[in-house]
Amino acid sequence: MMPSHTSMVHGLLKDSNPIPILSPSGVCCSAAHALEYCFLSVLSGHTNNAICGGSELFSPLLRSNIFEEEYKAISQIQSNPYIAFEKDFLRWMLSDGAGCALLSDMPSDGISLKIKWIEAVSYANELDVCMSQGLQNTASGEWTSWKAMRPVDWQTQSIFAIKQNIKLLAEYGVEKSVLHIANSCKKHQLNFA
């Protein structure tokens, strides 16, 4: 959706200057990607400081009434409760929140934290889509964007509801997290033994 959250925040700062902005999208890692971008900008000398902010307001998208039309349209809910669980799971896992941090090439007079490195990677080349919004998985395994669907199907199929592939998360979530941590520790010569 447009404009980006970052652009809207910058638009509210009427006394500020034109600045570089970035709006990573996603749920789980977007704030970490923003922090990495700010860190690399300051580290490289491109900027002297950067403000990293993260803000999530997903609760309006997780209310049960968002799924009512789909539940009415799907007669198999009783025989296949996984359909409901796939979406209801997220109602318990995601929450609203916001925060920000100022990164600078100089320590502050008070308490300062130092970032030595940030490692963020994607496994999208190896794994199927794990979390989605605005997509529909077809019977053949293809993904269809809401832009290619009829508007009448958007609500009956809860296209804009956030969906989590619980099976994929259960199978690979811990494995890929541990692999990434191990690779990062090796790269940065951290030994916890």
Model-derived regions, located:
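Conserved catalytic cysteine-centered active-site region
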Residues: 1-47
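Short, flexible, mixed-charge acidic loops at enzyme active sites
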Residues: 3-10, 66-70, 130-135
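Short, surface-exposed linear patches
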Residues: 11-15, 45, 72-76, 122-126, ...
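Conserved residues at the C-terminal ends of beta-strands
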Residues: 25, 53, 193
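Structural motif
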Residues: 49, 191-192
